[in-house]
Amino acid sequence: MTITKRKNTFYTSQFISYMKGYYLHPDIRGNLVAFTSDDDVWLMTLEDMKPIRVTSGQGVAIRPKISPDGKKIAYTIIWLRKGKGGGDIFITGNGETKRITFFGSMNTRVLGWLSDDEILVLTDFHTPFPQWSETYKININDGTMEKIPFGPISNIAISGDIIVIARGYQDLPFWKGYKGGTKGEFLISYDKGNT
């Protein structure tokens, strides 16, 4: 069997003709795809593959997540002003942008949506060290926060009753043979984290 490398395997030629650049942090919900490029959030449908810029000039946008109803996008904006950096969560939908957090922490990002009104956020806000991040559930309507007792995590995936937590997975890719205590691991719960 011969394996040949093809340029741009994951994109249709139609998509490439519209945009050339660096594409990061994709998220998909139904037929919608959100991603970042040129420090902004972009959105497109799988039918027409024509990206539309959703944000502009707010700072560096990262990790967009589309709401379950497909009407909102949560994302992190990172900025650097007068030698100090920060990051917070914003929601864009129905032509409006709303700032959800006021943490000012570079290590703040959206993990995903729990419902159309609640997001999961990972942040080092209220922790003694920037490497120590905790998970919060935030209501996007009234801003109420609830700390979720998952302990230290790097990422999370939720589907129905199943929760997969990733810990320590940012290790450098060339550490493949590393067998020490900080290698990444997945923890899986089949009952919404009750066990």
Curated annotation (Swiss-Prot):
GO cellular component terms listed in the entry, alphabetical order: cytoplasm
Entry similarity comment: Belongs to the peptidase S41B family.
Record EC number: 3.4.21.-
The organism's place on the tree of life at top rank: Archaea
Presence of the UniProt keyword Glycosyltransferase in the record: no
Family annotation (SUPFAM superfamilies): Tricorn protease N-terminal domain
Subcellular location: Cytoplasm
Location, primary (coarse class): cytoplasm
Protein's recorded name: Putative Tricorn-like protease N-terminal subunit
Molecular functions per Gene Ontology: serine-type peptidase activity
The protein's role, per its UniProt record: Degrades oligopeptides in a sequential manner.
BP GO annotations: proteolysis
Entry keyword RNA-binding: no
Transmembrane segments: none
Keywords, ordered alphabetically: Cytoplasm, Hydrolase, Protease, Serine protease
